[in-house]
Design a protein with these regions (language model features):
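Alpha-helical structural elements
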Residues: 3, 12-13, 22, 75, ...
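Short, Lys/Arg-enriched N-terminal segments with co-localized hydrophobic residues
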Residues: 2, 7-9, 15-30
Length: 211
């Protein structure tokens, strides 16, 4: 998934920077710059997603019948999400507890691993929630806009799709950037330990995506 790809790219870039740096001060400065680039990029992506969502919601949902159909779809989608996330939350708690036990008996590298798995799932679930909300809000608006003109319909459709896309990228970058900062500057981990821990973030996100 995209979360895992972002993680891989950041760690690869980290390794290249370390290899290219001859002095420790330069290495630290490069890492600090990378952290801020990732964080700023995440915020830009999330802000852009918000602006696109507001843009979509400004369009009309069309006739009264279209609005009723859209409301029924949203109601069904909300019921589905509630049932799905309730079930998935129970599974995540079980896996999280198992990982905590494994960390407690020394079978995992560190105590951050269970929490990395958990946050990966939470961010992935949040991205899915946003995607479902914007999709069910855009369907009638897209149909109504397409009735007026093809270009207008495509405009609504692409804007709603951009909300989900940039939300996934923004949340992924944000979580990776925060975890990298915690593991590198607070916990003092080396690159290998960071990679082992942050892989669980990707696993948590992927595990959530299975449902």
């Amino acid at each position: 998934p995209l979360f895992a790809l972002i993680l891989y790219c950041l760690l690869t870039l980290e390794a290249l920077c370390y290899k290219a740096s001859k002095e420790k001060k330069e290495w630290g400065k490069l890492l600090e710059n990378l952290f801020w680039v990732g964080l700023v990029g995440a915020l830009i992506a999330l802000i852009f997603a918000l602006t696109q969502a507001k843009k979509v919601l400004k369009f009309s949902e069309g006739t009264e019948l279209m609005q009723k159909l859209a409301a029924s779809i949203r109601k069904g989608a909300n019921a589905y999400l509630k049932r799905q996330y309730t079930t998935v939350a129970k599974i995540f708690i079980i896996v999280f507890v198992i990982l905590l036990i494994l960390a407690g008996v020394g079978m995992l590298d560190n105590w951050f691993i269970p929490f990395a798995f958990l946050t990966g799932g939470i961010w992935s679930g949040l991205a899915g929630f946003v995607g479902m909300k914007i999709a069910t809000s855009a369907n009638a608006r897209t149909a109504n806009a397409a009735h007026e003109s093809l270009n207008r319909g495509l405009n609504v459709a692409f804007s709603s799709g951009a909300v989900m896309g940039f939300t996934v990228v923004g949340l992924g970058l944000l979580d990776v950037s925060i975890w990298f900062h915690i593991l590198k500057y607070i916990a003092g981990f080396e690159a290998a330990q960071i990679a082992q821990t942050m892989v669980m973030f990707g696993m948590g996100a992927s595990f959530m995506a299975l449902f």
